[in-house]
């Protein structure tokens, strides 16, 4: 597999997983050898993917990444909220509407791909951005996207993201997928919300109840 192709594979290889490889067979004339030029790698079946996730979950749990005692406390009245999500689509619109209706608060949006090959890097950079931001820093970060297939949500199960969330100095709320979707991002975050709209309701008070 050529180095230039690796970033486009959308998969992190680990010992024990089964994959399907697509490519083309060529000959290496100087040594009379055949070689397979890898162009695409995908997981072989959802069952294999679930097995991989369960193994990863157990290993990270044993290392303490999901311990409740290590969760950071979220302010009851956050002055500003950082949002890592797609800058277009229903999710960000729902969040803005819910914040406006519930308890108007300053929002800082970090545009991110929430699916595909750029998703993981974008979200990690978003977390880093809010953590090093000195001016107008935020009190809490929401990572949000709508529902999707198991493969669509795989970036939110990556070990690199788990470690980045764990090390964040700012509390993080995971609002990934629908109510039945669970990711490793949910387990390591300081709070898990079943939906992006629910995340707002969980961290912001209702002004109608306060007045």
What are the functions of these language-model segments?
Residues 27-36:
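Short, Lys/Arg- and Gly-enriched loop/turn segments at beta-strand edges
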Residues 82-211:
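Short glycine/threonine-rich loop/turn motifs
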Residues 14-27:
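OB-fold and OB-like beta-barrel modules that bind single-stranded nucleic acids
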Residues 10, 37-103:
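Extended, charge-rich, solvent-exposed interface segments
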């Amino acid at each position: 597999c050529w180095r230039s192709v690796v970033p486009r594979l959308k998969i992190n290889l680990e010992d024990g997983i089964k994959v399907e490889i697509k490519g083309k067979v060529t000959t290496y004339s100087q040594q009379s050898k055949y070689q397979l030029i890898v162009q695409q790698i995908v997981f072989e079946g959802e069952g294999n993917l679930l097995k991989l996730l369960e193994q990863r979950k157990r290993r990270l749990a044993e290392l303490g990444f999901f311990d409740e005692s290590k969760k950071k406390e979220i302010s009851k009245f956050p002055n500003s909220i950082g949002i890592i999500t797609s800058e277009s689509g229903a999710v960000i619109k729902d969040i803005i509407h819910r914040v406006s209706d519930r308890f108007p608060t300053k929002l800082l949006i970090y545009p991110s791909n929430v699916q595909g090959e750029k998703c993981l890097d974008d979200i990690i950079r978003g977390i880093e951005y809010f953590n090093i931001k000195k001016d107008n820093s935020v009190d809490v970060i929401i990572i949000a996207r709508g529902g999707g297939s198991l493969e669509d949500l795989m970036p939110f199960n990556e070990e690199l993201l788990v470690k980045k969330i764990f090390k964040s100095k700012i509390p993080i709320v995971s609002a990934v997928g629908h109510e039945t979707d669970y990711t490793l991002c949910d387990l390591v975050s300081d709070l898990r919300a079943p939906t992006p709209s629910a995340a707002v309701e969980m961290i912001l008070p209702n002004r109608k109840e306060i007045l």
